Swiss-Prot record:
The gene is clk-1. GO terms for cellular component: extrinsic component of mitochondrial inner membrane; mitochondrial inner membrane; mitochondrion; nucleus. Component of a multi-subunit COQ enzyme complex. This is NADPH-dependent 3-demethoxyubiquinone 3-hydroxylase, mitochondrial. It comes from Caenorhabditis elegans. Catalyzes the hydroxylation of the 5-methoxy-2-methyl-3-(all-trans-polyprenyl)benzoquinone at the C6 position and participates in the biosynthesis of ubiquinone. Catalyzes the reaction through a substrate-mediated reduction pathway, whereby NADH shuttles electrons to 5-methoxy-2-methyl-3-(all-trans-decaprenyl)benzoquinone, which then transfers the electrons to the two Fe(3+) centers.
C-alpha cells in the first residue's frame, strides 16, 4: 500500500483562501499605518520628530503600494471596512500626536509591535503550509516585518515609552488593532 505524503496542510482552495486572508488583512494594516503617519505628520510636521515620522510614512507608502500590487496580482479585494479603518487610523495618528512626540511614538511602538507579531504568525503559517509555494510572499512579508520592527525601535529611541499613561495607551491601541485585524481577516 502506498501513502501519499504531503508537506502542505492546505488544498488548492484553502491555500488560495489563506493567501487572500493574508493579503486582505495586510493591505488593511498598511493602509492604517499610512493614515496613522499622515495624521501624526499633520500635527508634528515642524517638530523635532517631524522628519522621523516622514521617513516612516514614506516607508509605509511603499508597503501599501506593495500590498496593492499583491492584491491585484492575486485578485484579492480590499476589506469593505477600508474607509472606516482609514478614518479611524488618521484620527489615531492625530490624537496620538496631540499628546506630543511621546504620544506619537507610543502609538508607533504599540502598532508596530503588534504588527511585527502578526507578520510572524503569518510567516509561520505560510512556512507550515509550503515554503516553496509561498517563496515570494515569504520574502515580501519578512521584509515588511523587519521594517515594521525597525519603526518600533525608532519609537522606543524617540521616547515613546515616556508618554503619559503609556501602558494604558498601548493596550487601547493594540486592542483596536486586534479588532481591525479580526475584521479584515474575514470581510
Amino acid at each position: 500500500m502506498f501513502r501519499v505524503i504531503t508537506r502542505g496542510a492546505h488544498t488548492a482552495a484553502s491555500r488560495q483562501a489563506l493567501i487572500e486572508k493574508i493579503i486582505r488583512v495586510d493591505h488593511a494594516g498598511e493602509l492604517g499605518a499610512d493614515r496613522i503617519y499622515a495624521g501624526q505628520l499633520a500635527v508634528l510636521q515642524g517638530s523635532s520628530v517631524g522628519s522621523v515620522i516622514k521617513k516612516m510614512w514614506d516607508e509605509e507608502k511603499e508597503h501599501l503600494d506593495t500590498m496593492e500590487r499583491l492584491a491585484a496580482k492575486h485578485n484579492v479585494p480590499h476589506t469593505v471596512f477600508s474607509p472606516v479603518f482609514s478614518v479611524a487610523a488618521y484620527a489615531l495618528g492625530v490624537g496620538s500626536a496631540l499628546l506630543g512626540k511621546e504620544g506619537a511614538m507610543a502609538c508607533t511602538i504599540a502598532v508596530e509591535e503588534l504588527i511585527g507579531q502578526h507578520y510572524n504568525d503569518q510567516l509561520k503559517e505560510l512556512l507550515a503550509d509550503d515554503p516553496e509555494t509561498h517563496k515570494e510572499l515569504l520574502k515580501i512579508l519578512t521584509r515588511l516585518r523587519d521594517e515594521e520592527l525597525h519603526h518600533h525601535d525608532t519609537g522606543v529611541e524617540h521616547d515613546g515609552m515616556k508618554a503619559p499613561a503609556y501602558s494604558a495607551l498601548k493596550w487601547i491601541i493594540q486592542t483596536g488593532c486586534k479588532g481591525a485585524i479580526a475584521i479584515a481577516e474575514k470581510i
